[in-house]
C-alpha cells in the first residue's frame, strides 16, 4: 500500500502496533481509527497537526462565545433539508405516507429552529425532526428492520446496529476531514464541547447522516443485501453486524461517500467526501470573514 496515497487506516479487529509504526504514520500524516469488539469507536491516533493556525483557533473560540446559536441553527436546518431529501425520494416512489412529515418540515420545522432562543431549544427541534424521521421507517423498510426506539450503547436490534455503525464510520470520516483543515476539533457549536471526544466532528457529521448513513442503510436493506438471519449476531441484550455484514456495509458506505450529487451553492457535481470537507471550509469562511454558513 503506497503510503503517499493513504490518508487514514481503520483497525476493525485486534491489532498490535509499535512506536516505530506510529512515528512513520505521523511523519506521513496518516490517521488511524480503532474500533472495539462491539463495533464501537475506541479512539484515533492523531498525528501532530500540520495545519495549526493560532488566529483561527482564537476566532473559533470567539465564534463559540458570540455566534454559537447562528452556527447551530445552520447545522440543524441542514439536517432537516437532507431528511426532507431522503423522504421525498420515497414519496416520489409511491410512499405517500411520508407526506405528513414532509409537510411538517416545510411548514413548521424551519420556523421552530429560527425562533429558538438558545442551543437547548435548537437541539429540541433537532430531536423532533429525527424522531419524526424514525417514525417513517415503517413505510419503506421490511418489518425486520422497523425501529421501535433509538438504542445506541449497545444497539438492541438490526436497524439500531446499522445506524450506530454507520454513524461511527461517518464520525471518523469527519475527524479525518477536519484534520486536513485549520479547525480545532474540540470547539463545537451544536454539541456541547466536552472532554474525551472530538465534538466538532459530531457537529459537522450530523448534516450528512441522512444522505450518507441512512441512504446506505435503506439501499442495503431494501435490496436485501443485508438480511437479519444472515448478517447479524444477536445476543440477549445487543445486536451487531457479523463479519460478512460489516464488509458489505463498509463497501456500500465507501461507495456512497464517493457518489456524486449537484452541490446547491457550487452548481456542479461533487462527491459526498468532498462536500464534507467543503462544509469545514465554509465554517472557516464564516468564522474568519462572516460569510454565510
Protein language model regions, located:
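Alpha-helical/coil-rich non-catalytic "connector" segments in signaling and regulatory proteins
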Residues: 8-10
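Active-site helix-to-loop segments that bind/position phosphate- or nucleotide-bearing substrates
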Residues: 52-293
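A surface-exposed, charged beta-strand/loop segment in the N-terminal or early-internal portion
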Residues: 13-85
Amino acid at each position: 500500500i503506497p503510503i503517499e496515497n493513504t490518508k487514514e487506516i481503520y483497525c476493525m479487529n485486534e491489532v498490535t502496533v509499535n512506536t516505530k509504526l506510529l512515528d512513520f504514520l505521523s511523519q506521513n500524516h496518516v490517521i488511524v481509527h480503532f474500533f472495539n469488539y462491539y463495533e464501537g469507536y475506541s479512539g484515533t491516533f492523531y498525528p501532530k497537526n500540520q495545519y495549526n493556525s493560532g488566529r483561527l483557533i482564537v476566532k473559533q473560540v470567539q465564534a463559540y462565545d458570540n455566534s454559537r446559536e447562528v452556527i447551530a441553527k445552520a447545522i440543524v436546518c441542514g439536517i432537516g433539508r437532507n431528511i426532507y431529501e431522503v423522504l421525498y425520494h420515497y414519496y416520489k416512489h409511491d410512499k405517500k405516507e411520508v407526506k405528513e412529515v414532509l409537510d411538517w418540515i416545510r411548514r413548521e420545522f424551519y420556523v421552530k429552529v429560527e425562533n429558538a432562543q438558545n442551543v437547548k431549544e435548537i437541539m429540541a427541534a433537532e430531536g423532533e425532526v429525527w424522531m419524526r424521521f424514525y417514525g417513517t421507517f415503517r413505510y419503506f423498510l421490511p418489518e425486520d428492520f422497523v425501529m421501535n426506539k433509538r438504542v445506541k450503547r449497545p444497539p438492541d436490534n438490526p436497524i439500531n446496529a446499522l445506524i450506530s455503525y454507520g454513524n461511527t464510520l461517518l464520525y471518523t470520516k469527519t475527524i479525518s476531514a477536519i484534520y486536513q483543515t485549520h479547525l480545532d476539533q474540540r470547539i463545537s457549536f451544536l454539541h456541547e464541547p466536552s472532554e474525551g471526544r472530538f465534538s466538532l466532528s459530531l457537529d459537522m457529521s450530523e448534516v450528512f447522516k441522512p444522505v450518507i448513513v441512512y441512504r446506505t442503510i435503506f439501499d442495503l436493506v431494501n435490496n436485501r443485501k443485508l438480511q437479519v438471519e444472515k448478517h447479524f449476531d444477536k445476543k440477549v441484550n445487543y445486536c451487531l453486524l457479523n463479519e460478512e455484514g460489516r464488509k458489505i456495509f463498509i463497501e456500500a458506505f465507501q461507495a456512497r461517500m464517493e457518489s456524486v450529487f449537484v452541490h446547491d451553492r457550487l452548481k456542479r457535481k461533487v462527491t459526498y467526501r468532498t462536500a464534507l470537507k467543503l462544509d469545514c471550509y465554509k465554517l472557516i469562511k464564516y468564522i474568519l470573514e462572516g460569510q454565510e454558513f
